[in-house]
Amino acid sequence: MSVEAYGPSSQTLTFLDTEEAELLGADTQGSEFEFTDFTLPSQTQTQGQTQSQLDNQVNGPDGVLPNGEDAVGKTSQLLAELNFEEDEEDTYYTKDLPVHACSYCGIHDPACVVYCNTSKKWFCNGRGNTSGSHIVNHLVRAKCKEVTLHKDGPLGETVLECYNCGCRNVFLLGFIPAKADSVVVLLCRQPCASQSSLKDINWDSSQWQPLIQDRCFLSWLVKIPSEQEQLRARQITAQQINKLEELWKENPTATLEDLEKPGVDEEPQHVLLRYEDAYQYQNIFGPLVKLEADYDKKLKESQTQDNITVRWDLGLNKKRIAYFTLPKTDSGDMRLMQGDEICLRYKGDMAPLWKGIGHVIKVPDNYGDEIAIELRSSAGAPVEVPHNFQVDFVWKSTSFDRMQSALKTFAVDETSVSGYIYHKLLGHEVEDVIIKCQLPKRFTAQGLPDLNHSQVYAVKTVLQRPLSLIQGPPGTGKTVTSATIVYHLARQGNGPVLVCAPSNIAVDQLTEKIHQTGLKVVRLCAKSREAIDSPVSFLALHNQIRNMDSMPELQKLQQLKDETGELSSSDEKRYRALKRTAERELLMNADVICCTCVGAGDPRLAKMQFRSILIDESTQATEPECMVPVVLGAKQLILVGDHCQLGPVVMCKKAAKAGLSQSLFERLVVLGIRPIRLQVQYRMHPALSAFPSNIFYEGSLQNGVTAADRLKKGFDFQWPQPDKPMFFYVTQGQEEIASSGTSYLNRTEAANVEKITTRLLKAGAKPDQIGIITPYEGQRSYLVQYMQFSGSLHTKLYQEVEIASVDAFQGREKDFIILSCVRANEHQGIGFLNDPRRLNVALTRARYGVIIVGNPKALSKQPLWNHLLNYYKEQKVLVEGPLNNLRESLMQFSKPRKLVNTINPGARFMSTAMYDAREAMIPGSVYDRSSTGRPSNMYFQTHDQVGMIGTGPNPMGSLNIPIPFNLVMPPMPPPGYLGQVNGPAAGRGAPKGKTGGRGGRQRNRGTGNHGSGQPNMPNSQASQDLVSQPFSQGPLTQGYITMSQPSQMSQPGLSQPELSQDSYLGDEFKSQMDVALSQDSTYQGERAYQHGGVTGLSQY
């Protein structure tokens, strides 16, 4: 069957530009290689077509055919025949199959099947119901790479390998036609095919092509089964294949029938939006944390590497350091980080067998692939021997144990959080409170830059609230704002403030800023990271202890330990006791303690209580991760992040699908807590900020820098439009599967990226001012090698240019960014480039200029990319041709659909995994759509002076989008002090007892019950968000956005709100719905109920 049969124009198959249903978009850094489903017409579809054909022949209302036959009778006869044929096919493929039959579908033509050398199974080169052939599907999912052809096939029993070096990785292999002879030579992509001096001058390396194209083996190598063969074969879906592959890991002899057995592939319970109590919360999140832990353990323990060569060295602290290189892998699965624990074993016979544990102190970078580990103890280490070592990755459960412990503490310990935060986090409706505090006269902190109007508003509001969300779009001074908030909280004198973030880099950046204010800051890091240098090492707890003058005995013991390497047992005991005392003293006297979210579970903090807690980058942390610091006594909690950028990393797809990939920040937004958005960006040239602002932030970003500020002196680069430092460079290359089998690369794009980088360097840019980013690890790895071997300038220059994945670049910036899109195919889709949050991150890293290299034909099929390409074309920066003579591309694109939902902007970029039908169907919940009533017009005419919200008619009824009602109602007068209750809504739906304490575990079962017929209205958030702010300015123009076409926000036939979906989103974001996202948006919605036969607003 030809590949063309599967094209978009095919009438036989329906193309769905989607990833697998179970591969969630929110799993932002999971596997990059996904399989797009094709759907063969099912039996019912075929029958439906037959019926419609007959209907077309029916003449008149009586359903009589022209020849007088009864139409119904004729149809029944045809259907019976169709069913009979299907039965025949069933029996054909349930009979005994030969050993070499495809393990998925049963096709057994020797010319069509390939043997997987690793799994010892046969697979065909047909696609069936999936986009990739069955053999490629298996190789990718099982992470296998070596194959053998069938002995009765046209090429005989052949193991596919490189002619030059013997490499058997089929994802690396390709062929070169020999010029003289009618033969082809198999060579690996790197290094053999890229070598300038190939063995035989008849080989033209420029003709090299991969053996796997369009996700199947080339048809001359392995025949593709005919359409008839594939139709008669066992039909298997991508989802079944995925489950079968998982089953094979446990039981290699499992079959499709085993999938039907009870207990196989049980799905975990899905996360909820609201929880009855903390026990239910723990019972849902605990199993998800365990799933992720088990997956992580299996992944780490499967990474054993043999035959490692070690280079030994001695560190300044007298500890042994082992340097080694691991075999090249670009799978992206193994994320080796500084501080990780590694076990090194000697397996040879030149010295006694030995085993040592060490911590990673250096990871591969552009300068080299070497890894360095510092050994805990060097006793018996065979330092004279370099060869025959084995590396094992030691899995540590610490992070997951601390998450589980936090979930338990939240459930059983009354003092872990305040009553208000307890109920807010569980989604209970409680009265909003204002904290009575002395506001500073000047909000800017000493040692930090002056704040702009939106930053001042954020600081002022946060200080008065027990729970706040701050949304910081790219370059809006999120770190400065957070540091200023921490400064004012610390000045209030309520004990140390705890500051956390998911990553060590984010913690270090914030620690540095807070230190500039003059506060006493302690950076608490894991003991495994104490040897790792960072910009704030001098603030680290272990280093501050070294410099304590108040404990001379500790200093003497420390000096002795440094000189000798070890202490006697009695001295060691005394040293540890003194060290613990010093640590406690430093921590208790600190103004601010900074650590990672998981680091907050450190035993050294166990006895401490923190009234105020700030979590930066909270949208990149899973919810249990956020709970680790929260349960240390939070009475005032501030979450900072941006849900329009990439979310948490969840490796286990099952856990991600169940909602572990949802951040706490996002869930609270959905519950109706409006984030305070920072509005002035100081990073990007105004021309670079226009598109992200209009598409991702409803035009609310204002520019804190001018075009003149972003003109680089001594930089001579010819931009296609001198006033717009950006362009899209049209590249017509083809994507290839990378050597890991789980990622992609594009050689043509890599060559163009090198040319552009060289041009930027020649124009005066320094190497460290350029960042090259790509969504795919395969392309990142290929680019690093390509620049080294093929760059026309000195190798050292290219080494200093940072090449990273888009995900790794979040939170970073460079003067110039080159984005390589990689994807270029006829009908496979664009994979996880579909994720709009990834595009947002990619476009907002640059300060002075952005260059995108990609294939517009492939990208324009996705509506958001189509929007970007249209925008670049309108700006006359969609270009092609040689770099020294760029010309405008004549490529045409379809008119972009309207992407901005004026009713509920920005929400489409949030992955809402926590919604399920149970939540949506609860009568009276915020998603209750049982009524069609509309509020009177007075509730539509809202004016938010903070965000400059315009007024307009409300098409909510047709959009089927749930909006939390508390964002619509007029403001209540703010309470005067903590715990004060105002108005008739007092106590409605609030937990029993005072708001300041946890009160009862059970919610008020009267008006506050989810199951009640009458919805229960939370106190209005508007009281805190609709505060007058004279500094607010209007948004950037949105003139170029097409506004004419109506917004198609829900799929036809879907009535439940949790199934509504933005029209442009790919399948990765199915189940996305618009929800209230930010302070700068028009929040209008209906939440009516039937009362006494009259539809009206519920009592406020």
Curated annotation (Swiss-Prot):
ATP binds at Q455, G475, T476, G477, K478, T479, Q645, Y682, E813. SUPFAM superfamilies: P-loop containing nucleoside triphosphate hydrolases. Residues 42-67, 978-1065 are annotated as: Disordered. Residues 102-134 are annotated as: C3H. Residues 94-251 form the Upf1 CH-rich domain. Residues 1012-1063 have a biased composition (Polar residues). Zn(2+) 2 binds at C116, S119, H138, C144. Zn(2+) 3 binds at C162, C165, C188, C192. Keywords: ATP-binding, Cytoplasm, Helicase, Hydrolase, Metal-binding, Methylation, Nonsense-mediated mRNA decay, Nucleotide-binding, Nucleus, RNA-binding, Zinc, Zinc-finger. Disruption phenotype: Morpholino knockdown leads to both intermediate and severe phenotypes of abnormal embryonic development. Intermediate phenotypes show developmental delay, including aberrant formation of the head, tail, eye placodes and somites. Severe phenotypes show severe developmental arrest, including yolk extension defects, and lack of recognizable morphological development. High mortality rates of 80% to 85% at 5 days post-fertilization. Increase in premature stop codon containing slc24a5 mRNA transcript levels in melanocytes. Pfam families: AAA_11, AAA_12, ResIII, UPF1_1B_dom, UPF1_Zn_bind. Residues 162-192 are annotated as: C4. The keyword Nucleotidyltransferase does not apply. One of its GO terms (molecular function) is ATP binding. Residues 116-144 are annotated as: CC/SHH/C. InterPro entries: DNA2/NAM7-like, DNA2/NAM7-like_C, DNA2/NAM7_AAA_11, Helicase/UvrB_N, P-loop_NTPase, SF1_C_Upf1, UPF1_1B_dom, UPF1_CH/ZBD. Zn(2+) 1 binds at C102, C105, C124, H134. RNA-dependent helicase and ATPase required for nonsense-mediated decay (NMD) of mRNAs containing premature stop codons. Is recruited to mRNAs upon translation termination and undergoes a cycle of phosphorylation and dephosphorylation; its phosphorylation appears to be a key step in NMD. The formation of an upf1-upf2-upf3 surveillance complex is believed to activate NMD. Belongs to the DNA2/NAM7 helicase family. This is Regulator of nonsense transcripts 1. The gene is upf1.
